[in-house]
Each structure stands twice: as structure tokens, then as C-alpha cells.
Design a protein with these regions (language model features):
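Leloir-type glycosyltransferase catalytic cores
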Residues: 337-452
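Catalytic donor nucleotide-activated moiety binding site of glycosyltransferases and closely related
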Residues: 248-289
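A nucleotide-sugar donor-handling region in carbohydrate enzymes
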Residues: 138-230
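Active-site and donor-binding regions of nucleotide-sugar-utilizing enzymes
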Residues: 11-159
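Short, charged, surface-exposed secondary-structure boundary motifs
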Residues: 49-53, 145-151, 290-293, 335-344
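Conserved catalytic-core segment of nucleotide-activated headgroup transferases in glycan assembly
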Residues: 203-264
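A donor-sugar binding/catalytic signature common to diverse glycosyltransferases
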Residues: 292-339
């Protein structure tokens, strides 16, 4: 008697339109095997989901919808709990899997998962519920180049087969999940660009996006909401973006604020624009009918310059669209990020190391002509990321110590010091912990004798 092979259902977990576009590109590129059914599991991770549009309600989503057989809301599934704050109790995991198989019509299908940010909920919760399912992790931003932010349960980490990521920094391999031997796989850039083109051309995707000829596009991130800087400092950061763009000769400015940013920032920028003699358009809720991806603006407006702090969109502008880019404020963030293992550290480091400051006219002009970031030796960049990654998560990546020591011994200078903290280097006994002028002390016989004497007296007491 012949037994039919088991059905396979692939569940794709997404919380952003950009992430869904990454998944769509991976599907179009053949990165996933055929399956009997594909479900897009949508999560709205906003602080107050009820007041924010879910990604499946955003303009342009319909262009991506056809890749999936069904769309399911994770928020509805676990209501009234918030996706970022809920996970199943260990004893309840079998009950939850049984419930979801019934609710989603999965039956006895073999399950395969594709999730983002597996180290935290809600993606971690989904991976925990489907205990035996193999997992593919996809990363759509710069954080993929950094270390895993938390130690992942081996019962989850060892199930991860690969890391799908965009080639935002050519030649640099992601650190994420390498502690489990997970191999990275690039989602082809040309396929991703094609998907973004579909988003830009979709009905309603450009509603309210004004046709401004070759403006300087300023990207807001609402960093104060993350506790990285104060609201006043972030407002000043936006004004610095404006002044820098105008100093480079741009008088038509378009500001894309974070969807939840305070309206008073836009007013302050309007006043500054008048002083600078510039024309400012703010793409807020008074202009747009819904949030729009920066990449849609790149195709619609073809900006002459893109300015931001450490947004991934700076790299997509430079690497994928060949647009001139400039950074503002990374030096402040490198100093302020706390604790040192803050997961934003690698994105800020990459932007600071590879993209030009808005005050550097020549470098900004080169950034567009070169179609990519400022050239940095691959070994130097890999060494920098390895050193910062080890300093961030030494317990997760102990194998990176030799690479970190080599980099610090050879490259620690006035330029690279901003990526490290002396206290951190000291706690890890890394090069640079002791100032160069005092480096002779550990090798001095007299100093060693005094230290031993003091140590003995302390022990006796």
C-alpha cells in the first residue's frame, strides 16, 4: 500500500513591509524549496498596535500578497497579549502547537519556518511552539553583520539552517548566528530591486508622495524613543541634516520622519528651512495616506542626496540605487550607546566607518559615483567588525578573541578609538586597555615586585 508523502507548509513570519519584500525576493530567487502551502504570519510590533497600520494594510502589500497562499495575524492569534511581550510557558508549548495546527488548518503537515530576529519575541515564540520545525532566519538590515544580541537556547539555535540577508556591505560576512555554524546566503540584489519596483508601482503606494525634482532626502529614525539620545538632541540632529544638505548646495529638501515622531520636530525644521532659504516638504501624515518605504521614494523622486544617521536605507540608497549619501550624528551615538553590547552598535559602526560625514563634500560626491560605500580593505572591515563583535558579546563568541586582539594591536588609533571603550577593553584584557605611555609597566620588574608585595599584604588582611 502506497503512502502519500507528507505535505509541507512553510510559515513566513514578518513584521515590516521591508522584511516582507526581502522574503518575496528570496522566494522569487528560488531560495526556498517548493511547498504545498505558504503562510505569511504578520505581526504588528508597534507599542500600541491598535493605532498603527499592520504591514498587510499598507499600500503596496498587494504586490507581494500573491507569493503566499494565506495571510494570518499573529496579533489576533495571541490577543490580548502584545507580540513583543508574550511567549508560551514551556509546559504549554504542546498545547499551543496543537491549537495553531487546528486554527490554521495545518493538520499533520511538516512545518518549515522563516523568521526574523529569532533571538527575541515574537519570532522566538513561534520557533518555540513549532518545536521540531527547521528554521531559516532572514535579516533585512545592518544588524545581521553584528553578533547575536542574546544567548539563544541550543534547542532553537541548532535548528537554524541558514541566514538569508541582503548584500548591503559587499565582501562582509554576517556574524549573526555564526555561534551555531549557520551559513549566510545572499538574497540577490537584482531580484530585491525588482520586488521594490513592484512595490513602487503598486496602486496606492505613491499616494501623497509629491513629485519633487532631485531633492535632498532626510531620513528620521526617532532615536529618542529608543533612549539613545534626548528629544532635544534628535531635533538638533535633524537641523544638522538640513544645514549640511544646504551647505552642499541643495535647496529642495524632503524630510521623511519616523511614523511615530512628534509633530513639533517638523515645525522646527520648517522654521530652520526659512532661515536657510530652502524649500522643505515633510512627508508626515498630513501628506501621506500611509507610511512609505524610503526605497519607494528613491524610485519616485530620484533624490540628489540622502542624509541620515544610521538607517539601513542609507546603504540601500548607495549600494542598490547609486545615490550620494551622507551621515550625521554617528559620533554622538557611538559615545552614547549603552550598554556596550547594544545591538545598534554594529549598524552605527558600519555607517560611521563606510559612509561620509555630511560636511565632507568630496566624499559625499564620490559616494554616488562609486555606487557603494567608501572603499575599505576587506580585511580591515572584517577585523573591525570582529573586534567590536567580540567586545560586545565575548561569552557568545569567544573564538573571536584572536581576531580582536590582532585588529586592536594593529589598528587602534585616534580614528578607530571611537568604536571601543577603554573600560570594556580593560575588562576583557584586550590591547588598548592600558594607555600606550604606561604599556611598559607590566614588563617592569620593580613594578611587578611592588604589585606582588601589595597583593600579599591584602591577602593577609
Amino acid at each position: 500500500m502506497n503512502t502519500a508523502p507528507p505535505r509541507t507548509t512553510q510559515i513566513f513570519f514578518a513584521s515590516t513591509l521591508y522584511g516582507t519584500a526581502t522574503l518575496a525576493a528570496a522566494l522569487d530567487a528560488g531560495c526556498f524549496a517548493d511547498a504545498d502551502r505558504r503562510i505569511l504570519l504578520v505581526s504588528n510590533n508597534a507599542a500600541v498596535p491598535e493605532t498603527t497600520a499592520s504591514l498587510d494594510a499598507m499600500p503596496g502589500f498587494d504586490a507581494l500578497r500573491g507569493r503566499f497562499d494565506d495571510v494570518v495575524s499573529w496579533n489576533t492569534t495571541i490577543a490580548p497579549f502584545h507580540p513583543g511581550g508574550w511567549a508560551p510557558r514551556p509546559d504549554d508549548v504542546p498545547l499551543w502547537e496543537r491549537h495553531l495546527r487546528l486554527a490554521w488548518g495545518l493538520g499533520d503537515d511538516d512545518i518549515e519556518l522563516a523568521v526574523e530576529s529569532i533571538q527575541v519575541n515574537p519570532a522566538l515564540a513561534v520557533a518555540q511552539i513549532f518545536t521540531g520545525a527547521p528554521v531559516d532566519v532572514y535579516a533585512d538590515g545592518l544588524m545581521s553583520y553584528g553578533p547575536t544580541r542574546n544567548k539563544i537556547d541550543p534547542l532553537v539555535g541548532t535548528r537554524v539552517r541558514r541566514l538569508l540577508h541582503l548584500d548591503l556591505v559587499p565582501g562582509l560576512k554576517p556574524l549573526l548566528l555564526t555561534e551555531f555554524g549557520v551559513a549566510p546566503q545572499i538574497v540577490p540584489s537584482e531580484v530585491f530591486l525588482k520586488v521594490l519596483g513592484e512595490l513602487a508601482d503598486a496602486p496606492g503606494a505613491q499616494d501623497g508622495v509629491l513629485s519633487v525634482e532631485a531633492p535632498a532626502l532626510l531620513l528620521g529614525q526617532y532615536l529618542s524613543a529608543l533612549g539613545l539620545i534626548s528629544a532635544a538632541e534628535e531635533e538638533e540632529l535633524h537641523l544638522r541634516m538640513m544645514r549640511g544638505a544646504v551647505a552642499l548646495g541643495h535647496t529642495r529638501l524632503v524630510f521623511k520622519p519616523h511614523p511615530t515622531a512628534p509633530a513639533q520636530w517638523s515645525r522646527a525644521m520648517g522654521e530652520e528651512a526659512e532661515k536657510l532659504g530652502a524649500e522643505l516638504t515633510v512627508l508626515d501624515e498630513g501628506v501621506l495616506t500611509a507610511p512609505v518605504l524610503a526605497e519607494v521614494l528613491y524610485q519616485r523622486m530620484r533624490p540628489a542626496l540622502v542624509v541620515g544617521c544610521f538607517s539601513t536605507a542609507l546603504f540601500t540608497a548607495s549600494a542598490f540605487y547609486g545615490l550620494p549619501v551622507a551621515r550625521v550624528g554617528t559620533e554622538v551615538l557611538l559615545d552614547r550607546l549603552a550598554p556596550y553590547e547594544n545591538s545598534n552598535r554594529i549598524p552605527v559602526t558600519l555607517v560611521d566607518a563606510l559612509l561620509p560625514e555630511v560636511t565632507d563634500r568630496a566624499a559625499v560626491e564620490r559616494s554616488g559615483a562609486a555606487r557603494g560605500a567608501e572603499p575599505v580593505a576587506a580585511a580591515d572591515l572584517t577585523g573591525l567588525v570582529s573586534a567590536v563583535g567580540f567586545a560586545m558579546q565575548p561569552r557568545i563568541y569567544p573564538g573571536l578573541r584572536p581576531a580582536a586582539e590582532r585588529y586592536l594591536a594593529a589598528h587602534l588609533d585616534t580614528t578607530t578609538w571611537r568604536y571601543f571603550k577603554r573600560k570594556r577593553l580593560t575588562s576583557l584584557a584586550l590591547p588598548g586597555a592600558v594607555p600606550a605611555q604606561l604599556a611598559f609597566l607590566p614588563r617592569n620588574a620593580v613594578v611587578r615586585r611592588v604589585a606582588r608585595s601589595v597583593r600579599r599584604r591584602v591577602v593577609r588582611q
